Structure formats: structure tokens, C-alpha cells
């Protein structure tokens, strides 16, 4: 993969750089809060990857995927001063964001002419939520970088199973699974798609082994602690957050306050806490939340089926009842609606009943929305599919 910069992509990168510097200056987080802050603090003070504490004692984490907390902690090791620590994070995320723009441009060139790729890259680079993301302590910027690397590698492998891209695809796949556990499903889908296109089982198995090698240290860690083979176990929390009597499309914020938001689980959670610190606490808590979410859905299936389609609609277009600050700002809602409409039209125009690359993109898009809609839809989730949406939109 040759990194050659012409004046077009240089212009886009310069615009992207300026916009993101402005975003960081005005909108940056001034501290690490919520789960990120807790995990980094526990790594620093207690040498344990932990997001929950029982009676003041941190318990091992299986709730959060590990890559972004470890990314934060790796910086914290060298920069203990809070201000410097945060600025290094923003600078690093800015670098990831600029590389993501370049990768997006290379991806668009796999489908379109230079002029159309320039337009797509400019839209990708200036999409307001994408610009804003770099100023936040969130895994989304790192995720987008890895995802763009994943897609570019997949495109190259789809056309020619080159060893160089085989390794890039394997690395990006493994790291994506460590930043968002559900990528296991999409990596598996991609491998199956590759096999049916190229019929090269040896190379597909090689990728599988390499991915397994990347994630195996964390799988072994979780097996030793929890006796389960998984990267994360938070399906109960996520399902309940998006499927309880008082929830909405974007879910109900309930980190460290589940019992207050869903009183039906309060008694069981209290008993779990009264038993004292337990290395399997995260696993046991998630089982309680999963059982309760399933019970809610069984009690009123019609309500939650309708809610599922509301979530699907809100992901594809907009959430008509969002409580997120500035969600309805013209700078957010107009580009989002424009992209949503063009994506849908592009999806309809480009889809064919063939085993081709554009169908992979279309199926990847639909499958992601379908999966997320079982849980809840946050505004930033749309960023994870921004590249896919722009590809589909450019087929107009």
C-alpha cells in the first residue's frame, strides 16, 4: 500500500486538520470520566483492568473491551500530568483521524474515479460528527481508523489474496474485536464472503489463525478468570439498557445506576454486592440483567418489536425523540439526513444478487444496523458506518 499524496488528498487532509484543531480547542473533554476514567484509575492505582468495584474492591473486567482503555493507560504511563496526558491523547487521535481520511480516499478509489473519490473524501473529512469525535475521550476515532484499514485490506483481498493485505486484514480484524466485541460477527461474515469469492481455504484459515493469535492473550485472561471464552460479556447490560419499560431509542444512561433505572433488578444486584468481591462479579451481574431484559421482552413482545424498528429507523435516518445535546443542531441533522437519504438510494441502485464487493458493503451496512437495533442507538454509532454510507451514497 503506497502512501502517495497528491494535491487533492493533501488539500482534504489540510482542511481536516484545521477543522479538528478547532474542534479540539473549543470542545475537548477536560477530564476522563465515567468508565474510561475508572478503568485507567484502577490500572494506575491497583494494576487491574476493572470498571466495577464491590465494597470498595475493584473486580476483574469483562464488561468493557480492553483496547481503548489500554491505549489510554499506555499514554498515562509516560505522561502523569493530566493536561499533558489529555493533549497527547488528542494529538494521537488527530493523527488517527487524518490517516483514516487518507485510507477513506484510497478505499473510494477502489470504486470510483479520482474526482468522485475526492468528493467522497471531502465529505468524510468534514462530516461534523466526525470532526467533533476527535475532541472526545471515546474509542470511536481509533475504531474508525482500524475499520478503514479493515475495509481497505478486505477490498484488496477480495480482488487478489495478497499476503501483505492478508496480514493487514488480520491485524485490523483482531484489534477491532478488542475495541468492539461484536466485530467478531462481522469478521466471521467477511471471512465467509472471502471464501466463497476466492475459494482459497488455506488463506482464509491463515487469517483466522492470525486473528486468533492477536486476541488469544485476552481470551486466555478471561478464561482463567471467568471460565468463559469471550472478549466481552455485556449483552445483558446493553439489551436491558435498550429494552425496559421506560427506555427509548437511544437507551437509558444507567452506568453504575442500573438498580435505580430498572428497580426490578435492584434486589438481586444488592444481594450480589452483599456477597462481597467476587472475581466473576461482572459475569454474574450481566446474567441478572440479561434475564431481566428477556423477561421484559417476553411480557410485551409487540412493544419491543416496534421499538426495534424505531431504532432501525433512527439509525438509518434520525431519532425523532433524541435527548442528546445539539442532536437537532443544523450542523448535525442536515448532513445526517442528507447522507441517510443518499445512502438508501445508493443502496437500492447498487444492490445486485451477486457475490460482488458492493453487495458486501450493502450487507455489512444492513447487518450492522440490524444488530445494533436489538440494543440501543447512540448518535456516535452512525460514525462507525460513515465510510460505508459514503460509499453507497457515491453510487448515485
Which positions does each model-derived feature cover?
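Transmembrane-helix motifs of polytopic, lipid-linked glycan transferases
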Residues: 10, 91-112, 149, 153, ...
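Transmembrane-helix signature of polytopic, membrane-embedded enzymes
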Residues: 101-126, 144-145, 164, 356-359
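Membrane-interface transmembrane helices that cradle and orient dolichyl/undecaprenyl
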Residues: 111-114, 150-168, 176, 194-198
Amino acid at each position: 500500500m503506497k502512501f502517495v499524496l497528491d494535491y487533492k488528498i493533501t488539500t482534504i487532509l489540510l482542511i481536516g486538520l484545521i477543522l479538528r484543531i478547532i474542534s479540539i480547542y473549543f470542545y475537548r473533554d477536560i477530564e476522563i470520566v465515567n468508565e474510561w476514567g475508572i478503568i485507567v484509575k484502577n490500572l494506575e492505582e491497583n494494576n487491574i483492568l476493572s470498571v466495577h468495584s464491590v465494597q470498595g474492591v475493584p473486580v476483574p473486567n469483562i464488561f468493557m473491551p480492553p483496547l481503548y482503555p489500554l491505549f489510554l493507560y499506555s499514554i498515562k504511563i509516560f505522561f502523569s500530568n493530566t493536561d499533558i496526558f489529555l493533549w497527547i491523547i488528542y494529538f494521537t487521535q488527530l493523527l488517527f483521524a487524518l490517516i483514516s481520511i487518507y485510507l477513506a480516499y484510497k478505499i473510494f478509489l477502489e470504486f470510483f474515479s479520482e474526482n468522485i473519490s475526492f468528493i467522497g473524501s471531502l465529505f468524510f473529512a468534514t462530516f461534523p460528527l466526525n470532526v467533533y469525535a476527535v475532541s472526545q475521550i471515546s474509542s470511536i476515532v481509533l475504531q474508525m481508523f482500524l475499520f478503514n484499514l479493515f475495509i481497505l485490506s478486505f477490498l484488496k483481498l477480495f480482488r487478489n489474496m495478497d499476503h501483505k493485505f492478508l496480514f493487514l486484514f488480520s491485524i485490523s480484524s483482531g484489534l477491532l474485536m478488542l475495541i468492539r466485541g461484536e466485530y467478531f460477527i462481522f469478521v466471521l461474515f467477511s471471512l465467509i464472503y472471502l471464501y466463497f469469492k476466492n475459494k482459497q481455504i488455506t488463506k482464509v484459515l491463515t487469517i483466522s489463525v492470525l486473528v486468533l493469535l492477536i486476541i488469544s492473550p485476552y481470551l486466555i485472561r478471561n478464561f482463567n478468570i471467568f471460565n468463559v471464552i469471550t472478549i466481552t460479556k455485556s449483552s445483558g447490560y446493553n439489551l436491558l439498557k435498550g429494552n425496559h419499560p421506560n427506555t427509548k431509542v437511544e437507551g437509558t444512561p444507567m452506568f453504575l445506576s442500573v438498580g435505580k433505572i430498572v428497580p426490578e433488578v435492584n434486589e438481586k444486584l444488592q444481594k450480589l454486592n452483599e456477597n462481597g468481591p467476587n472475581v466473576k462479579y461482572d459475569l454474574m451481574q450481566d446474567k441478572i440483567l440479561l434475564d431481566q431484559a428477556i423477561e421484559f421482552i417476553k411480557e410485551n413482545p409487540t412493544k419491543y418489536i416496534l421499538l426495534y424498528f424505531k431504532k432501525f429507523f433512527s439509525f438509518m435516518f434520525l431519532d425523532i425523540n433524541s435527548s442528546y445535546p445539539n442532536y437537532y443542531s443544523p450542523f448535525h441533522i442536515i448532513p445526517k439526513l442528507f447522507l441517510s437519504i443518499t445512502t438508501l438510494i445508493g443502496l437500492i441502485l447498487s444492490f445486485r444478487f451477486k457475490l460482488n464487493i458492493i453487495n458486501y458493503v450493502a450487507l455489512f451496512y444492513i447487518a450492522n444496523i440490524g444488530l445494533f437495533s436489538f440494543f440501543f442507538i447512540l448518535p456516535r454509532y452512525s460514525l462507525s458506518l460513515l465510510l460505508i454510507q459514503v460509499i453507497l451514497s457515491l453510487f448515485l
